[in-house]
Regions:
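Polyanion-binding surfaces on beta-sheet-dominated domains and ring/shell assemblies
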Residues: 1-150
Length: 150
């Protein structure tokens, strides 16, 4: 814990640029790296994977009967940030319930935890623009390419 800095300021000031990886046109931060950085600064930080009860016992995903999503949270210094994320395939499209595997759910949990960590500040900029409609994303990518050429 750094004096006079909020959790957000402390984590947001960590340069993660050399740890950012890309896959299928999207940038991401490894969950292991993100969690390691959080624990270095805040050893008492905790995460939670939400579960729901079934007749067979608790399971770690939620469903509407068609697709599935996971819910996780990260708590640092008493502040909990919750993140929900669809269970997706390698193209980042929702997986239908009949095709869902435990591997898919586990990957979604780790990605969700990384996004919950980002809400606390670490690598938050990585997710800027991910909520833009596809047309706006394409325009933004064109502008970024043009700026890189200049």
């Amino acid at each position: 814990m750094e004096e006079n800095k909020s959790v957000f300021e402390t984590l947001n000031n960590i340069n993660v640029q050399d740890k950012v990886e890309s896959k299928n046109g999207l940038s991401y931060l490894s969950w292991a790296f993100a969690w390691g950085e959080v624990k270095k600064k805040y050893p008492n930080a905790q995460y939670k994977i939400y579960e729901r009860g079934t007749d067979y016992g608790p399971i770690n995903y939620f469903t509407d009967g068609h697709t599935a999503w996971v819910k996780t949270s990260v708590t640092i210094e008493g502040l909990e940030h919750i993140e929900e994320l669809p269970v997706m395939d390698y193209k980042n499209k929702s997986i239908t319930l009949d095709k869902l595997t435990s591997f898919d759910v586990n990957k979604a949990i780790q990605r969700s935890l990384t996004k919950a960590i980002a809400r606390h500040g670490l690598g938050l900029y990585i997710y800027a623009g991910e909520d833009l409609p596809e047309e706006e994303k394409i325009e933004q990518q064109k502008k970024e390419k043009e700026q890189a050429v200049e």
